[in-house]
């Protein structure tokens, strides 16, 4: 449709403009990574100044603010985004939802402690994350049975990473907590190595889990978050792992 085509054009325009502005202000920075807090904050500012149609403006602001929360790494980031939620004319329901997402993200930012996060093993027993980490540097990644083609690519990527970085523990966490049987079927069907495959236990923020698909969290040996804004498809993923190992 014409509207869809226009929105796609607008999406690309905002992306390109955010890259241009980043390059202008930060010559040494990697400005092409769009999945960062800073890039999303830049795009929110662009929407605020350039888009005046109420419906389009609302749609973009809600979307970019939600993504900005998910890529936030610090308390300062979340406080800034909280002011944006109050600044724009969102409904009370939407404000409540976004503030709830901030609350959830605050448990995943850098230096957050994930020892007591509840996960479910393949015998359907509940465990604390710290119990399966074996005091190793770990990379946690989330996935869903509802994306089978992506699941196959993920397995290929993870197997390559396991071979390259044998001292890192790669832990897969499935988000389909309502479908344990389908999860078990998927890991036995697709995975040659089913060690370190778990399912998240549902809690009050369960409706947000799907927003975190593809995100990767780097944990030190004490189950503390050291990096949380990376996605598995990042072209510099190896560099992020090497920097992580060197910093520990």
Whereabouts are the PLM-identified features?
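Oxidative protein folding and maturation machinery
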Residues: 1-124
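Short, internal strand/loop/helix patches
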Residues: 10, 22, 42, 184-221
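Short acidic, S/G/P-rich loop/turn micro-motifs used as interaction or catalytic elements
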Residues: 69-72, 145-149, 177-178
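Short active-site neighborhood of thiol/selenol oxidoreductases, capturing the structured segment around
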Residues: 127-158, 169
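Loop/turn elements at helix/coil->beta-strand transitions in domains of secreted/extracellular proteins
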Residues: 134-138, 165-169, 192-195, 221
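Structural microenvironment flanking redox-active thiols in thiol-disulfide oxidoreductases
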Residues: 149-189, 201-206
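Thiol-/selenol-based redox modules, centered on thioredoxin-like
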Residues: 218-248
């Amino acid at each position: 449709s014409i509207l869809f085509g226009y929105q796609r054009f607008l999406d690309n325009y905002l992306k390109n403009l955010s890259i241009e502005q980043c390059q202008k202000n930060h010559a040494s920075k990697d400005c092409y990574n769009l999945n960062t807090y800073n890039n999303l904050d830049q795009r929110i500012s662009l929407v605020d100044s350039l888009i005046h149609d109420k419906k389009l403006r609302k749609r973009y602001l809600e979307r970019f603010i939600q993504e900005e929360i998910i890529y936030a790494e610090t308390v300062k980031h979340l406080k800034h985004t909280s002011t944006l939620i109050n600044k724009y004319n969102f409904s009370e329901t939407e404000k409540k939802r976004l503030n709830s997402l901030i609350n959830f993200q605050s448990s995943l930012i850098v230096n957050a402690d994930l020892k007591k996060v509840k996960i479910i093993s393949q015998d359907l027993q509940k465990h604390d994350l710290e119990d399966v980490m074996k005091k190793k540097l770990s990379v946690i990644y989330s996935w869903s049975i509802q994306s089978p083609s992506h699941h196959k690519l993920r397995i290929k990527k993870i197997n390559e990473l396991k071979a390259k970085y044998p001292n890192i523990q790669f832990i897969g966490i499935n988000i389909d907590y309502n479908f344990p049987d389908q999860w078990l079927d998927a890991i036995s069907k697709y995975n040659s190595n089913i060690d370190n495959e778990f399912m998240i236990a549902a809690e009050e923020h369960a409706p947000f889990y799907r927003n975190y698909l593809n995100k990767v969290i780097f944990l030190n040996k004490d189950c503390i978050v050291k990096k949380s804004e990376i996605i598995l498809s990042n072209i510099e993923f190896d560099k992020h792992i090497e920097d992580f190992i060197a910093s520990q």
